[in-house]
Amino acid sequence: HLTNIGAGKRYGKISEEIKQRLDFELEVIANTGYPGYFLIVQDLIAAARDLGVSVGPGRGSAAGSVVAYCLGITSLDPIKYNLLFERFLNPDRVSMPDIDIDFDDEGRGKVLDYVIKKYGTDQVAQIITYGKMAAKSSIRDTGRVLDLSLGETDRIAKLVPNMKLNSIFQMKNDEMKQNLRGEEYSNVKQLKEVYSSNDLAGETLKQAEILEGSLRNTGTHACGVIITPDDIREFVPITVAKDSDLYVTQYDNSVVEQAGLLKIDFLGLKTLTVKLIKYNHKIDLDPNQFPLDDQKTFNLFQRGETVGIFQYESLGMRRYLKDLKPNVFDDLIAMNALYRPGPLEYIPSFISRKNGTEEIRYDLPEMEEFLKETYGITVYQEQVMLLSQKLAGFSKGDADLLRKAMGKKIFDLLEKLKPKFIEGGAKNNHSPDILGKIWKDWEAFASYAFNKSHSTCYAWIGYQTAYLKAHYPAEYMAAVLSNNMNDIKQVSFFMEECRRMGINVLGPDVNESFYKFAVNESGAIRFGMGAIKGVGKTAVETIIENRKDENYETIFDLVKKVDLRLANKKTFENLAYAGGFDSFKSSHRAQYFYIDSEGTPFIERVLRFGSKFQENKKSSQMNLFGEQSDNVYQVLKLPDCSEFGNLERLKNEKEVVGIYISAHPLDDFKKE
């Protein structure tokens, strides 16, 4: 019923092809016992949209299902892109279907609450993850237990390259010379010397080697949620999450699936851009409605300006995009599938064929129908499945077996299917020699072939992010910076991209900044106050809340208004160091740290003044004229001292943010 209503909305007129496909899918879903699964997912997504949570386009093999498309679970038409349902669920293969749904980061909690409310706390659990001891943490833990000094433990742990301890200590000298370069080589040499000594440090390394890889702690799977038809304790062992009252399974992801439980992946999609656009431009955007022929977006791909674009941001990919000059969505799907170890070697030929410098050839004219979009190169498993049906009359189940045999390199199965393919093709009047060549090509290509449903979904998410970057560059980059706020290397990398794009990134400012990076009225990006060390979310909230009616004029104005229980001395000091008060024209950064004759920094005196002012206001000790009876304000004057020098100012910025914001120490030495 729901599928038919959805089909009417999605397609308008239902053609015979669509009707047959829907009947086939619904029959398989009913026979494999999964109608409930589809209904739960459909209900979740509808509820999320009602709650104002943005939902991604759906990823993975589920994109091959027309039923999922009609129910609003996925947002790409599988018939238009030749995506196959058998890739997701087929009558001969009864493995659990797995639908990955993206909810935006902030909305995920809301959806989880909805699931618990609907199905009850005793039928919903998150999935446990087991954290293992890695090389460095096993050294640190062992050092702590054996009482090796903290400094020495840290020094040894920092020598470990990105390798297992066991591999390091078994490595022979000539292997070391061959595989390790420069600093890594000398570090490993030192490690081996410590290992072979009989002192406490040597003992620490020997014990750490034994402990490496053992389970250290448990966490919660960021995305997975289990829903059971009855009390969850009847199905799996459970425990309670560390940071909430929610149940968590004691089985991890792989076991849960084998136990045949209903697993739904919640994956947080970054939808901050859309929120920023709404805030700045008062436009409500739905990325699932973006047109797939937008010239501005394709121009961005053609210039290779895809830094910060999902799946298309690596250096190699950007180079290939410039050569390929993609101008249709199919090109993006193919590049996503080809840009991986293995099929990478096909990219130059793919580019030449697209640009007309290499001839497009088909072994049989019938192959053009399915290989045209990839210029005669077999890129997807789906193409092999469709061609085996068309050329040799394979059933849908056989075609999926062939895919499985190729993808997993099951050579016995391939041997079994080959005669079936040659004979079936011969019945359709195709030359056995040509069929043999096609089969040989497929075998060579088999291990590379990619799932087109995956590629299409990834390309669609990549396209949506590129569309936003092309049309709303400042908002998009502000969102990218916010998503990487905790990784300062990434922040400076993306700030460089902003400079290339001609977007100004301004330092933090208590009158303009939010917790995350945002775009101001003049189209520049403002640093997020949350990126400053020691400045917490609640402190930022009270600063934002109290400037709604008017901006803060001075530091005194600020401490009179904000809740000083939430914004403490550390918050104020680090804001000052980062330049958060630079918009107060009457003062400069050094004044806040001026120490008076009693040894008190000025910022501390300002905070005392603020507390006193707020106390007095509370106890409403006002005189007749409504003025503050306590005259503290007049006593505090900005100290007279010289400003920080350029280098000191920058050193302070780097200390509290991790990067230089207002300039760079070497700017003075730039060539004119």
Give the residues covered by each predicted segment.
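Noncatalytic, beta-rich nucleic-acid-contacting surfaces in large DNA/RNA-processing enzymes
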Residues: 1-672
